[in-house]
């Protein structure tokens, strides 16, 4: 397996970064995960635009143009012969020696790019059967719109869910539902798709954006606004979405069944529309038997 370190492809076991890298010491950087189907990137431009936007919000300069970055990632995918999988890439602010919270005034730090590509098949069974979630207080910072390397709050929530045999932790600030530890959450109520507004309290997921777009195109009403824990528990359907899990239904929340405990009809419809977008961009998909 080869990985990308700046503009070089190297064997994973030979890849190194400096111990004084601010990404390692502070989590000072941004990242993206881009999905591949049939060896083709899906919603690549949207992901890369968000990467550069996240970097701009923290005054981090990505040391490559978008065109150069695309060429590097294409080489990474080809070298590892990825068909259906994920590309993880991150850019840190770079090396500062000695370590200091304050950035140096006399010279700009040079950002460090790393990336890896792995084969990860689609989990068709999960898309249909779904899984459970827990609810957890959202204790993260107030700039969740930045896809930052700082993920400790997400990690703690996700692992708490895992310990309770749940797929996800649905986060809330008081009564207001925001998103999940590693995905967005949406509900269906009276035929309306309801999801939190794209503000500083959530990451505006790329899959979330595609879902909203296909819903509107196909006559499903969309409401981008706050909803409460009560709304969540009384929803007709609940699903989570992200680059890696596509659209996955939530059948139980905190041990309580959602509606009839099965994937709802609008969730199924939205996933069909979503798959149509994938096929349009990347070609026909192989389905798990």
From Swiss-Prot:
The modification N6-(pyridoxal phosphate)lysine is found at residue 147. One of its GO terms (biological process) is D-amino acid biosynthetic process. It catalyses: D-alanine + 2-oxoglutarate = D-glutamate + pyruvate. It comes from the Bacteria. One of its GO terms (molecular function) is pyridoxal phosphate binding. Its EC number is 2.6.1.21. Keywords: Aminotransferase, Pyridoxal phosphate, Transferase. GO terms for cellular component: cytosol. InterPro entries: Aminotrans_IV, Aminotransferase-like, BCAT-like_C, BCAT-like_N, Class-IV_PLP-Dep_Aminotrnsfr, D_amino_transT. It is an enzyme of class 2 (transferase). Transmembrane segments: none annotated. Pfam families: Aminotran_4. CDD domains: D-AAT_like (cd01558). Pyridoxal 5'-phosphate binds at residues 50, 179. Substrate binds at residues 31, 99, 101. Its cofactor is pyridoxal 5'-phosphate. The active site is at 147 (proton acceptor). Belongs to the class-IV pyridoxal-phosphate-dependent aminotransferase family. Homodimer. Acts on the D-isomers of alanine, leucine, aspartate, glutamate, aminobutyrate, norvaline and asparagine. The enzyme transfers an amino group from a substrate D-amino acid to the pyridoxal phosphate cofactor to form pyridoxamine and an alpha-keto acid in the first half-reaction. The second half-reaction is the reverse of the first, transferring the amino group from the pyridoxamine to a second alpha-keto acid to form the product D-amino acid via a ping-pong mechanism. This is an important process in the formation of D-alanine and D-glutamate, which are essential bacterial cell wall components. This is D-alanine aminotransferase. It comes from Listeria innocua serovar 6a (strain ATCC BAA-680 / CLIP 11262). The lineage of its organism: Bacteria, Bacillati, Bacillota, Bacilli, Bacillales.
